[in-house]
Every structure is written in structure tokens, then in C-alpha cells.
């Protein structure tokens, strides 16, 4: 498939936060399609394209660890934002993290590795001379050189993601999952956010089959809002 890319990613820790956990972060069992898309976009993205995640290969056993992380205690208040808008100045619209830092517990993933299989689609912002092949080749060149617009991360910025492009003719890295770990119902998982319709989250039933999660299309019937 000429329009396909496969990217091997790995890291010491990861946290793909479940939205239903309000106070302390708890990670999903594996990377979400939206987080995978974010990693690809950190390497190459333009308004002309969207990355579509097709498959996620889970290469290492799912292991959790409890840690404590420094987080900002509160968001900037709505009244401060409204005041800045009225004044037409953002001079006072800031927060000092040293004054509002809190330690919070988090349940994160340890020693993770995946292969992201994805393709690109053109958006309405694409120029007449643009096509998916052009952007796929740009992505491959950047990934081979280790280039990125910003450091890809495993859910949160303090957990960097290392990456390596897998050529179309190269085999996938060997999975370290045991026989009993290859097939597993992972429950409902965030697919992505529909930014064009009120930032609505979409969810799908994630199932690990032979170590692979098949990601349905964003507007498929099995994807729920």
C-alpha cells in the first residue's frame, strides 16, 4: 500500500489518560488512536493532510506502575480570561506553576512499544499540486532522519516517545507478548475528538486480536459518541 506508513515507537513510560478519571491520572491499557495520530503529526503534519490510524501493534506486555507527578493545581479562571478579553490585553493572563504546583498520584504504563500503521488523507485545505504520496514521502524522509517538529510523547510530555520508520519491505519487530496476552478485550477507548462538531469525543470497543488492534474508521457505525 503506497499510501501507508508503519512507525515503531517505544518508551520507558506512557500515560494515555482515561477521561472518566477526574482527579488522578489513570492510563488506558494501550496507546489510543488519537495519541498515535499526535505522534505522527509531531514528525510531519500540514493543514493539507490528516493522519488516519489503521492498526496498532502491541509489542510488549501491558504493565502498570503507580507514580507521583508534579501537576498544575488549577486552570486559569474564567473571570481572568473574560477580563483579559475586555481589556484586550493578555498581560496578566498567566499562572506561575511554582506557586500552584501539586503532587498527584498517577497509574502509568511501564516499558511500552507499539507499531503504528496509518495512512494520510487530503483535507479541504490541500493545494491543487498536493497529494498523499508527496506527504507520505516527506514523512518517511523525516522519520528516517529522526526529525520532528516537536518531541513526540507517550501521552504526556515528560514521557518521550522514541521512533523508527519501518520500511514497506521490512518485517515488524518481534512481539514480546505471551500466548495468553495476544487476545484481550480492552473495553471502550477514546478514538479521537471531533473538532468540527463541538469537540465531541468518539469511543470504540478496543479488542486485541493476535496482538493487533484494528482501528475502525472515525465515522464507522461501531464508533460511538
From Swiss-Prot:
Q: What is this enzyme's EC?
A: 3.1.-.-
For this chain's record, the cofactor binding note is: Does not require a metal cofactor.
**For this chain's UniProt record, which GO biological process terms are given?**
defense response to virus; maintenance of CRISPR repeat elements
Annotated keywords: Antiviral defense, Endonuclease, Hydrolase, Nuclease, RNA-binding
* InterPro entries, A to Z: CRISPR-assoc_prot_Cas5, CRISPR-assoc_prot_Cas5_N, CRISPR-assoc_prot_Cas5d
Keyword Kinase set for record:
no
What protein am I looking at?
A: CRISPR pre-crRNA endoribonuclease Cas5d
Q: Which gene encodes it?
A: cas5d
Amino acid at each position: 500500500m503506497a499510501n501507508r506508513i508503519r512507525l515503531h515507537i517505544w518508551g520507558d513510560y506512557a500515560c494515555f489518560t482515561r477521561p472518566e478519571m477526574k482527579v488522578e491520572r489513570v492510563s488506558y491499557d494501550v496507546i489510543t488512536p488519537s495519541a498515535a495520530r499526535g505522534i505522527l503529526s509531531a514528525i510531519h503534519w500540514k493543514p493539507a493532510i490528516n493522519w488516519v490510524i489503521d492498526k496498532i501493534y502491541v509489542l510488549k506486555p501491558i504493565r502498570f506502575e503507580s507514580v507521583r507527578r508534579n501537576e498544575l493545581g488549577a486552570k486559569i479562571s474564567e473571570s481572568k480570561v473574560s477580563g483579559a478579553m475586555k481589556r484586550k490585553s493578555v498581560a496578566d493572563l498567566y499562572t506561575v506553576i511554582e506557586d500552584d504546583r501539586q503532587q498527584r498520584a498517577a497509574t502509568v504504563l511501564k516499558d511500552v512499544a507499539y507499531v503504528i500503521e496509518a495512512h494520510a488523507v487530503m483535507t479541504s485545505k490541500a493545494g491543487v499540486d498536493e497529494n498523499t504520496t508527496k506527504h507520505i514521502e516527506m514523512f518517511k524522509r523525516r522519520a528516517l532522519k529522526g526529525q520532528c517538529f516537536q518531541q513526540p510523547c507517550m501521552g504526556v510530555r515528560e514521557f518521550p516517545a522514541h521512533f523508527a520508520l519501518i520500511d514497506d519491505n521490512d518485517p515488524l519487530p518481534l512481539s514480546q507478548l505471551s500466548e495468553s496476552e495476544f487476545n484481550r478485550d480492552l473495553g471502550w477507548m477514546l478514538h479521537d475528538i471531533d473538532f468540527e462538531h463541538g469537540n465531541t469525543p468518539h469511543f470504540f470497543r478496543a479488542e486485541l486480536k493476535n496482538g493487533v488492534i484494528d482501528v475502525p474508521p472515525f465515522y464507522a457505525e461501531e464508533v460511538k459518541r
